[in-house]
UniProtKB/Swiss-Prot annotation:
Coiled-coil region: 482-520
Motif (PABPC-interacting motif-2 (PAM-2)): 84-104, 111-131
Stretches the record annotates as Knob domain: 521-612
Gene this protein is translated from: PAN3
Organism phylogeny: Eukaryota, Fungi, Dikarya, Ascomycota, Saccharomycotina
Protein species of origin: Eremothecium gossypii (strain ATCC 10895 / CBS 109.51 / FGSC 9923 / NRRL Y-1056) (Yeast)
Region annotation Disordered: where it falls in the sequence: 44-64
Protein name per UniProt: PAN2-PAN3 deadenylation complex subunit PAN3
Amino acid sequence: MMMNKSKTDWAKDTPCKNITIYGYCKYENDGCIFNHGKPLSTSSNTGGAAAGSAEDSAASGGVTVGNTGKSTFNAKTATSFTPSVAIPDFNNIPSFTPERIVSSPAGDGATAFTPSFNPYGSDSFNPSANVSGPGSAVFAAASGNAGASATAAPRSQSVHVGTGGYLPLAGTAFPTVYPPSHSILQYHLYAPDPPPHLQVPLKANERTPETLFIPNNLREHLLKRNLSALQVFPSDGNLPDIVGDYFGLVPLEFHNRQTGKGRYLGHQNSLYKVFSNFDGKVYIIRRIHDVKTTDVGQISLPFRKWQKVSCPNVVKVKDAFTTLAFGDSSLCVVHDYYPQSNSLYETHVANYTVVPVTQKYLWSYLVQLSNALNEVHRHGLSMNNISLDKVIVTGDPGRIKVGDSAVHDILAFDEGRDIAKEQQADYSAVGALLMDLAQRMLGTRDQPLDSMDIDPLFKRVLAYLLSDEKKTIAEFTALFSHKMLDIISSSQTYSEYIEQHLSRELENGRLFRLMCKLNFIFGRMESSMDIHWSEAGDKFPIILFYDYVFHQVDENGKSVMDLTHVLRCLNKLDTGVSEKIILVTPDEMNCIIISYKELKDSIDSTFRSMTQ
């Protein structure tokens, strides 16, 4: 079959991609219409020049010459890639210069490679950017310098409880889980919904782009949570790189408010966000400074009890251990991490935008704290020192959790404890917390309960909690049992709202899989020589449909990027509707009338033939 020469003249100056990819073209003498000219050789035929280039390469530490005359590349000793052609001068191009660059000692005869930007060496990105601290040994080990890693300070051994028998690998200096990306999520670039007074009324069968995805406020809230979970801050050099099975410590307390002396039995404390080297998840570590432990059961026994507590209003305990990584014997208790969560103190008192306390919030907090009390007391434990700092708000509508679980039980392990008395104190602590919030709602401090202008039933509940009589969870919840129905209704409504939007996103990867299938079969090199992909072939409508969906242009020749058009076409193609469309060639000389069902069958058969 002879091709029209006028139709192949356009390819005579186009280099054949087979030459570029494979170095040869098996169709060169069998009808390939592309240019098969050999690229100019940059190597010299003189032995002196070859020897000189080999010596220069060997001096750079990347290439060695053997007895056979063949040069070999050694990646371990190579410092940088040096191409054999002329390199443009980039010295005049402005580039980012970090404030501090972490450099690793290079091997003998090698020049250290210093990148123009190192995110893990810059104070703006890396939370452990100190060069002289323990992190220097980590970078030395990662660079392959055995001498530096041999002189690194050994890691302190930690006594772990909640790792399920997992122990870190001996000699492992760098975490096996890579730190998260530092790129900022551009959620603010999404087009927001128009204000209510500008929204156009829609018919029952009409949709807007906003209705095709999750609501903007919910998406923005979830993206902010992800950003908060991955966010890190520059280290001041006083924090270790790795603590037990966790790395990437980020301080979380910034308001500098002193904790009550009785909360941690007089010990100082710190709170950090960490990344687990065991499962890659994000947790928080409550560090109690300078804790002396003499009995192994002091940590293991309380931890095992608290691990059995499973309540939506109590923060789950994940791990507990002691470590010397901070320079003292510190107790570290690991809990689940809830991004964008604040304590009740930060939510209603300390933040710049304080959330006003309402009677609805008070009833919601009361019901949830009652649920936490019931679950903790049922396991023979007590919460101890419930306060505005210990209860965190994890989301709307007013969802709270009691944190710092198991810390007090470990610190007071050796002391003679009366659990029944501590459980009665929990009721009084809940009453004092709600009393404080009620006074803040009214704007008065130290106001007697009898003179407070609040719901009489709520006032009766507070009087019961603050009284000296013995309390039980049954008597306590019986006072406001009908109020629980409102909280249950609100919680179920919110769950159905989230489930509704989740069901809409259930198959959101369906169109992505379809686009992947189209790109797998479209534009392949071997297709240019296949008669089935020519204008008279049965696969040519796939090419025209691809251009119809993604390569639209207006009357001025400007590219049109219409998301609605793409979604409409791909949805019809995925379902295989019988609707027919007209596909026109770029030169507008030919057109094809074909249905989406026929297109789908053609794409599926082509994809199956590639996978067989």
